[in-house]
Amino acid sequence: PFWEVQYQDAVQYLLYPWFMVLLFLVSGMCARYYLEGHTDREFLAGRTRKLLVPSTIGLFVFWWIQGYFNMAFSHVFDQSWEKVPKAVGYLIMVLSGVGILWYIQVLWVLSVLLVLLRKIEKDRLYVFGEKAVLPVLFLLVIPVWGAAQILNTPVICVYRFGIYGICFLLGYYVFSHEKVTDRLACVSVPLATAAVVLAVFYVRYYFGENYAEEPVVNSPFSILYGWTVCLAVLGGMKRWGNRTSRKTAWLSKKSYGLYLFHYLALSAAAYFLDRYTKVT
């Protein structure tokens, strides 16, 4: 059922340039809303319990299972694995099991840095951020592009501290203001149109290349497309999605658990399909 050219991969090209960028923007906004009613100590305690513990101690207790599947997909166990000491093999599986937990690892680091920054700037940046008008919001793509060029870890390309860090801070200091998202809501239709047009050209231009690594992932086109979609989503959701239903309330309660476990379930399903069926 598979062909040499995987056209369904276009979905990944559509999502990758903006999905995590948007998630860090929203994470910064959520940090602001939480800190309006809690102390820095409460914020750090909650973030450590919810972000750091699962992504560190949790790796040794549970997420090594994800590492097992990751290594099985890579055929590591077919390469004289029996010669590796069991303790060393376990540690390798632990490291391989990080998977999607990289997001909460980065988010915890940024949360700690945010608390330190708050002690220095005393909310002056937050007050200044409310003044950001539409041209400024559009031009923020320039520092975002600049940040995308720095603080990127080698080999493991998901740890992009530069772009994710600036987006987290922009979410906290700029986009957490109702006036700012109201401005985006006023131009949500043009933004959505621009996002769709850029999406078509982006997929057409880069299809077949590795969208997750340099030079594609931090190219001017990738950042422009990703930033435009982020603004369009924030403006569109403020205009049309600013409501709560039973379904969204349920998702809010379950989203963290779905985030933690969805990849393991998908990996397990893919493993058994690959090993015990003729699908592939």
Q: Model regions: which residues?
A:
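Alpha-helical transmembrane segments and their immediate juxtamembrane cytosolic regions
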Residues: P1-T280
